[in-house]
Curated annotation (Swiss-Prot):
Organism: Homo sapiens (Human)
Identification of the protein by name: SH3 domain-containing YSC84-like protein 1
Subunit details: Interacts with SH3D19.
A single GO BP: regulation of ruffle assembly
Residue numbers spanned by region Disordered: 218-266
Keywords: SH3 domain
Domain of life: Eukaryota
Family: Belongs to the SH3YL1 family.
InterPro entries: SH3-like_dom_sf, SH3_domain, SH3_domain_YSC84-like, SH3YL1_SH3, SYLF_SH3YL1-like, Ysc84_actin-binding
UniProt domain SH3: residue ranges: 283-342
Length: 342
């Protein structure tokens, strides 16, 4: 666990980056179902990252420190503002617990509550819910929640966990003043009046990576959806294949030279001989263009993609029939209603 004792803002920003990595990277201790989804952070209006210590003997007390950052209108993250956390609780609890917390601010009103300064009570001023977990969680799951704040906690100690209900978040004005070398309020820091400091670059690097992950994930999802829709559309638009096809044989194909080659070539489909006798071979092969993709279903079928140009070796007078053609050195039969004459 990280140090919950309040320190300067540079150290708090460094601690925040470390905590955020621990909550979002897959490790031997964190499986893909135990991390904060990229879209939760990518869509967040702000984040508060803290370390908290909780001690109890009949009455429990908690305290800790961290930072809060907000997303600016241009999509970038604001400079960090130092915060503290404090709270009291009842119940017969004995022990000490140190926890790392990531608090996701889902709405602008949550950021504004942090920016106004003073004491902010979680569960009073803002509705709190345990945040969703899992790398493959769909983005709309988080959007369906009405909670202004998501919380994530990792604890080590004798308590089962940390409840933030009733905890107060406090603006650490003196820490901000020392770091920014001026009297400055959280509002001015979180709403972009202060340039983000180089000392917090590690934090910004990991925050920006979530936007990139989310965008890449969205592109992959959109590509898969488009591919599925295209397959559905293609399946609807494909014309029916001819019902009758030449009879298939398991005999190997043998190719000989000369006029005998055509007859031996059709041993894979013995029925094709009468088919050719009915039509005859073309003296000058013609070309057709595939309107649809065709994936062969039996040996001897000619595979092609929409747009391929196929050389026709022999054909019938009907387009609702099987023709024979050649493409990229392969010879086979194909449904004639899948192509158009050039």
């Amino acid at each position: 666990m990280n140090n919950p004792i309040p320190s300067n803002l540079k150290s708090e920003a460094k601690k925040a980056a470390k905590i955020l990595r621990e909550f979002t990277e897959i490790t031997s201790r964190n499986g893909p179902d135990k991390i904060i989804p990229a879209h939760v952070i990518a869509k967040a209006k702000g984040l508060a990252i803290l370390s908290v210590i909780k001690a109890g003997f009949l009455v429990t007390a908690r305290g800790g420190s961290g930072i809060v950052v907000a997303r600016l209108p241009d999509g970038k993250w604001s400079a960090p503002s130092a915060i503290g956390i404090a709270g009291l609780g009842g119940g017969f609890e004995i022990g000490i617990e140190v926890s790392d917390l990531v608090i996701i601010l889902n709405y602008d009103r949550a950021v504004e509550a942090f920016a106004k300064g003073g004491n902010l009570t979680l569960g009073g001023n803002l509705t709190v819910a345990v945040g969703p977990l899992g790398r493959n969680l769909e983005g709309n799951v988080a959007l369906r929640s009405s909670a202004a704040v998501f919380t994530y906690c990792k604890s080590r100690g004798l308590f089962a966990g940390v409840s933030l209900e009733g905890s107060c978040l406090i603006e650490r004005k003196e820490t901000n003043r020392k770091f920014y070398c001026q009297d400055i309020r959280a509002y001015d820091i979180l709403f972009g009046d202060t340039p983000r400091p180089a000392q917090a670059e590690d934090l910004y690097e990991i925050l920006d990576s979530f936007t990139e992950k989310y965008e890449n994930e969205g592109q992959r999802i959109n590509a898969r959806k488009a591919a599925r829709e295209q397959r559905k559309s293609s399946a609807k638009e494909l014309p029916p294949k001819p019902l009758s096809r030449p009879q298939q044989s398991s005999a190997p194909v043998q190719l000989n030279s000369g006029s005998q080659s055509n007859r031996n070539e059709y041993k894979l489909y013995p029925g094709l001989s009468s088919y050719h006798e009915r039509v005859g071979n073309l003296n000058q092969p013609i070309e057709v263009t595939a309107l649809y993709s065709f994936e062969g279903q039996q040996p001897g079928d000619l595979n092609f993609q929409a747009g391929d140009r196929i050389t026709v070796i022999s054909k019938t007078d009907s387009h609702f029939d099987w023709w024979e053609g050649k493409l990229r050195g392969q010879t086979g039969i194909f449904p004639a209603n899948y192509v158009t004459m050039n």
